A protein has these predicted regions:
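Short, well-ordered coil/turn segments that N-cap beta-strands
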Residues: 2-5, 42-46, 68-70, 129-131, ...
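C-terminal helical cap(s) of enzyme catalytic domains, especially alpha/beta-barrels
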Residues: 83-101, 149, 161-186
Length: 188
């Protein structure tokens, strides 16, 4: 069985057009309602993954807290179009004559992620709930990791950097973060 469930309210990949993914994360009432349904039957931890494709990240976070989610994760990818082919005049990438938007990730989204983690870390309702925050979005180095932790994250997720540099990056990240924490006198 699974150790947990992540409700992905942030996916921009072809789901938002059908009222799923990031469309759910943009409507706090939907976020609370669906999370509540899952919490009624789940016997394992439920994490709500929030979309960055919203003006106020606090509203869906508070909705997830109200529905008693076990944790929050953020940010998912930023809805984007990466290019337009100037020869074919079509959105790129294009498969079978169809192009579309997708999710933008990696170091370029880090400032957005830091801002949103900070908003949740500083929100009185989210903070008072004690709900864990797991941060992602542009984490490539131990310095990136430290910034997210200082703004309110209790755990981190790294994907794009691992895809680019391999799993070795995690050991470097952990070593660098540990050394920095020791130099600052942080125990945890």
């Amino acid at each position: 069985g699974a150790d947990g469930i992540e409700l992905n309210y942030g996916c921009p990949h072809g789901m938002s057009e059908r009222g799923m993914g990031s469309a759910v994360g943009q409507v706090p009432e939907y976020c609370e309602q669906i999370t509540g349904w899952v919490m009624q039957v789940a016997r394992i931890p439920v994490i709500v993954k929030l979309t960055p494709n919203i003006t106020n990240i606090v509203a869906p976070a508070r909705a997830a807290v109200a529905a008693r989610a076990n944790a929050l994760s953020l940010i998912n990818t930023v809805n984007s179009i990466t290019a337009v082919d100037l020869d074919t005049l079509e959105i790129s990438p294009n498969i079978g004559g169809k192009g579309g938007h997708g999710g933008y990730a990696g170091p370029a989204v880090k400032p957005i992620a830091l801002n949103m983690v900070s908003a949740l870390g500083g929100d009185e309702v989210v903070r008072a709930s004690g709900i864990p925050i797991s941060a992602m979005g542009g984490i490539s180095t131990w310095r990136d990791a430290a910034e997210f932790l200082l703004l309110g994250a209790g755990s981190l997720q790294v994907c794009t950097a691992v895809m680019h540099y391999g799993f070795r990056i995690i050991e470097d990240l952990c070593d660098g973060l540990s050394n920095w924490m020791d130099s600052k006198g942080f125990a945890s």
